[in-house]
Amino acid sequence: RDVERSRGLGDVYKRQGITRESVRAALEEHPEACEVIITSPTYEGVVSDIKGIAEETHRFGAVLIVDEAHGAHFNFHDKFPESAVKCGADAVIQSIHKTLPSFTQTALLHLNGNLIDKDRVKKYWNIYQSTSPSYILMAGISRCLTFLEDDMCDSVSLGYMDEYVFRLTNLRKEIKKLKYIKLQEVDDISKIVLVVNDGKNLYDKLLNDYGIQLEMAS
């Protein structure tokens, strides 16, 4: 990951996702590689060039596996980045409980194309999964997907994701008006990344004075 540190209101980090050029260079250096595994989006909402990376990976005869744990919501609104599921990745793992209305521990594995042996995946899935799966969690996954599908089909009222994006857009506009807090622009608008002189101090103040729980501070 290329990181550039500039001076200003604290340290402002400009992060770029993984590029197709960096993947091509890595595969040229290691032509024996049979798979490429990347995380996109990052925890901070930085998205890599999945389409370009998929093209390079397949050109070298390898498969692309994307950890899209924090991007399960991408498919459900055009204001979010395009999901790796639609960008040519061969396998995509999504933790739907992170950004969608589902129980903790729920996740999905998407397999695309024919480069990955689906029967082999099922074989090892059966070996490593619990012999006593939680039907509550599985029902939660089903209910989550049904809810989102119905939400997208509702053309009359403002849907769940429409309202979510509306609130995100307004929040980001208001944050940009602040004098001592900078909003770091990232690919995923649902990630509110704030840049201040003392992140821990802001974390504690929002939690103790306003009851707002941030995910992390650095």
Residue ranges and their predicted role:
Residues F166-S218:
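Conserved C-terminal alpha-helix-loop-beta "cap" of PLP-dependent enzymes
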Residues I37-I38, L64-E68, A91-S95, P101-S102, ...:
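General beta-strand structural signal in soluble alpha/beta enzymes
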Residues K14-H73:
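Active-site phosphate-binding strand-loop segment of PLP-dependent enzymes
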Residues V85-K123, Q129-G140:
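Active-site PLP attachment segment
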Residues D2-Y13:
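Single conserved hydrophobic/aromatic residue that forms the stacking wall/gate
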Residues Q16, Y43, H70, H97-K98, ...:
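Hydrophobic alpha-helical scaffolding
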Residues H58, V85-K86, L207-N208:
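Anion (oxyanion) recognition and catalysis
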Residues C144-N170:
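Structural signature of PLP-dependent enzymes
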